[in-house]
Amino acid sequence: MAKVGKRLKAAHEGIDREAFYDLPQAVHLIRERATAKFDESIEVAMNLGVDPRHADQMVRGVVELPHGTGKTMRVAVFAKGAKAEEAKAAGADLVGADELAADIQNGTIDFDRCIATPDMMGVVGRLGKVLGPRGLMPNPKLGTVTMDVATAVKAAKAGQVQFRVEKSGIVHAGVGRASFTEEKLVDNVRAFVDAINKAKPTGAKGTYLKKVSLSSTMGPGLKVNLGTISGAA
C-alpha cells in the first residue's frame, strides 16, 4: 500500500487540479503520469448541457477513432446461414442464434459488442434484461442491427466507440492507451469530441459542451481548455 500511495502522490505532483490545460499539454501530463505496471487506459469525460430524461436531449452514437482504442474487442453476432459465415470470416468471436441466446441467458457474456441481423431480433429481444443494462443490446441507430455484419464486425474490431450520455449529463469513453503516442491520443480525443458535437440533440438549450476532462486509469484528472480542441463549442 505504501508503494501505491507514493506512486499516486508522485502522479499528482506538479498538477493544478483547478487549471485548464491545452489539449496537447494535458495529454503529455496524463501520459507522463501513467506509471502503473499495466498499460493504462486514457479516458475522456465530457459534461454536457442536456437532460437525458427528455427524449429530445439524448446524446447517443458511435465514432471510429482514427487510431483505435488499444482494446481487444470480442464481438458476438446473431446470424444464420450465409450471414453467419460472413460474420465468422470478418473475425467475429461468437456467432450463433438460439444456442448463443441460451448461453447468454445462462450468464455467459464473454463479449464487448453484440451485433444482429434484423431477422434475429425476435431472439435477441428476449435478452433485453440481460444485454440492456450492460449496454450490449443491438440497436439499428448504432449500426449493430444490420445485414452488413462484416462491416459492423470489422468496425468494432478496429476500435469503434459507442457513446451514450448518463443521467448526470456526462458522457465518457476510453480513447486509447498510455502506450499510444501523444499525437495519436490528441487525434483520438479530437475525433471523439467532434462526434459528440455532431450528436448535439435538437432539444439542447444553452451551452452544450460544458467541460472536458482527461485522465488515465490510475492517474489524476485534468480539465482541458475547450478552445484547444478542434470542433469544440
Swiss-Prot record:
One of its GO terms (biological process) is regulation of translation. One of its GO terms (cellular component) is cytosolic large ribosomal subunit. Keywords: Repressor, Ribonucleoprotein, Ribosomal protein, RNA-binding, rRNA-binding, Translation regulation, tRNA-binding. The keyword Nuclease does not apply. Pfam families: Ribosomal_L1 (PF00687). Signal peptide: none annotated. SUPFAM superfamilies: Ribosomal protein L1. It comes from the Bacteria. One of its GO terms (molecular function) is rRNA binding. The keyword Ribosomal protein applies. CDD domains: Ribosomal_L1. Part of the 50S ribosomal subunit. Binds directly to 23S rRNA. The L1 stalk is quite mobile in the ribosome, and is involved in E site tRNA release. Belongs to the universal ribosomal protein uL1 family. This is Large ribosomal subunit protein uL1. It comes from Rhodospirillum rubrum (strain ATCC 11170 / ATH 1.1.1 / DSM 467 / LMG 4362 / NCIMB 8255 / S1). The lineage of its organism: Bacteria, Pseudomonadati, Pseudomonadota, Alphaproteobacteria, Rhodospirillales. The gene is rplA.
